Regions:
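Conserved catalytic-core motifs of GNAT/GCN5-like acyltransferases
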Residues: 145-148, 165-182
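Amphipathic alpha-helical recognition patches that constitute DNA-binding helices
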Residues: 20, 109, 127-128, 143, ...
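Conserved beta-strand-loop-alpha-helix junction that forms the acyl-donor binding cleft
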Residues: 115, 146-156
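GNAT-family acyltransferases
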Residues: 1-117, 179-190
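PDZ/PDZ-like domain micro-motif
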Residues: 118-119, 174
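Conserved acetyl-CoA-binding loop-helix of GNAT-fold acetyltransferases
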Residues: 121-135, 153-161
């Protein structure tokens, strides 16, 4: 599956993307300073290659009828990162699909990682999220959420530009480089 908007393409993973993931999770890790930097994510090339190959194998035969939870982002022919979605519960905490009980209210929550730093500041992230939101709207989603931390000013600006409004703030949720930051959740009615 592939969706295009302006200079952005959201698409399913290609086998050639595996080596990008290996690089992004082992050597070119600057993006990790902005995506939950309190979590340890560094790995070795062999582990990442095996993991992403397994993921690719599990996803490559997916029918276009299946609503995607993740797309790769391409800008001007370059694989630059991904958008993804996950569920959060009524307290805005991550919850597995398997943990959701009948009748439980959950929130469709989206995120983005632009791993190629030469693309930062060129609106690729804004356009990719706008396209992902439209995809979910076309698949029946009425409201969508995104989460970040108060130190990620660029993501906050993108969320606000797209019309998200802050709906939850968890005080002093994270420590990054010796400073404490709040956890933020934003909501958008679509």
């Amino acid at each position: 599956m592939e969706i295009q908007f302006n200079n952005i393409v959201l698409r399913d993973m290609k086998e050639s993307d595996i080596e990008d993931y290996v690089r992004w999770f082992t050597t070119e890790i600057k993006w990790m300073d902005w995506d939950a930097p309190w979590e340890t994510k560094k790995s070795d090339a062999d582990t990442e290659r095996k993991s992403w190959t397994k993921y690719y194998e599990s996803m490559r035969e997916m029918s276009d009828d299946v609503v995607r939870w993740k797309f790769e982002i391409e800008s001007e022919g370059q694989h630059i990162g991904w958008v993804s979605s996950y569920l959060t519960d009524e307290n805005y905490d991550w919850i597995s699909v398997k943990q959701v009980k009948d009748g439980q209210k959950v929130h469709q929550t989206i995120g983005i990682d632009i791993c190629e730093s030469n693309i930062w500041g060129k609106h690729a992230g804004t356009n990719a999220l706008r396209t992902f939101i439209q995809y979910y709207a076309e698949n029946g989603c009425k409201e969508i959420y995104t989460q970040t931390w108060s130190g990620n000013v660029r993501m906050i600006r993108v969320a606000e530009k797209l019309g998200f409004q802050e709906c939850n703030r968890s005080k002093v949720e994270h420590e990054v480089r010796g400073e404490t930051y709040d956890g933020l959740t934003f909501m958008l009615r679509i």
